[in-house]
Amino acid sequence: MPRVVYFAVAFLWAAAVGPLPLKGAETKGPLSFDELVEYFDSIVFQSEIQDVQPSRVVKKWTQPLRVAIRSFEEVLIEKDGREILRLKQVKVRKPHLKFIKKHLNSLIKATKLKTEDSKKTGELPNFMINFVPRRQMGNPYLAKANPKLLKRLASEGGCYFLVWADGTTGKIKSAIIVVNSERLLIRINHCLLEEMTQALGLPNDSNRIEKSIFSDRSRRTDLTRTDLIVLKTLYDPRMKVGLVRAEAMTVAREIIRDLDAALP
């Protein structure tokens, strides 16, 4: 699960598989109100990597998602007398499309975000999902990012995401998800839900509770009540993009109290 890396203003947010250290014992039952507030804070504003500054403002999507899905396989070509492995784009597998459609529908329902067809709007996709063989996960062709960072993110061999956001306004501009196509389908299904959820502005993991998409111990393929509270809190109209942490957490308490009372 995610490791998060921050850069200033041209702001790149990156995450790959790897757990957030526990602050305390795992909670088996439902979280209390105060624990839900703390959980939201840990997912949105804390940092998983030592010496890396956590996010200081609320970051989320304010524009429609234009989703594109690509799948690649390795091909061997000969160049200058040498054999080289390259990526070749192929048809996306039906199970992968099914997983993405299911998760996208769940996320759109929870956040009220809009989607657009980039072919109809003429605008480039801003939410790209790539399926590649494991050893190609760090291929610089997949994302315009530091090759060393891509290699680091790919080293876990599961999946990772990168998000570009404005460090001041908090508006997310684009996201790229890279998935190891050689994994078992059940792992890919979980991985897609995790990365798609976190690419919406919820970058961190927490093992505070096992029954959560944000837990390193989880292999869930649907969102729990706690997950929905966290996601809905971020995308509640009262949670303005760009709010600094202190203000955001004051607003979060109000929203979480309402959601905790309303959700079954």
Please provide the spans of the model-predicted regions.
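Metalloprotease/metallohydrolase-associated module, dominated by Zn2+-dependent proteases
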Residues: 27-43, 49-52, 145-187, 203-264
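Second-shell loop/turn segments in exported
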Residues: 69-79, 83-95, 176-187, 213-222
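Non-catalytic architectural context of zinc metalloproteases
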Residues: 25-81
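Boundary at the C-terminal end of the N-terminal hydrophobic targeting segment
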Residues: 17-27
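Bacterial N-terminal signal peptides
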Residues: 8-16
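Bacterial N-terminal signal peptides that target proteins for export
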Residues: 1-8
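Metzincin-family zinc-dependent endopeptidase catalytic domain
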Residues: 90-193, 198-199, 203-209
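A general structural signal for short secondary-structure junctions and capping/turn motifs
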Residues: 3, 118-121, 221-222
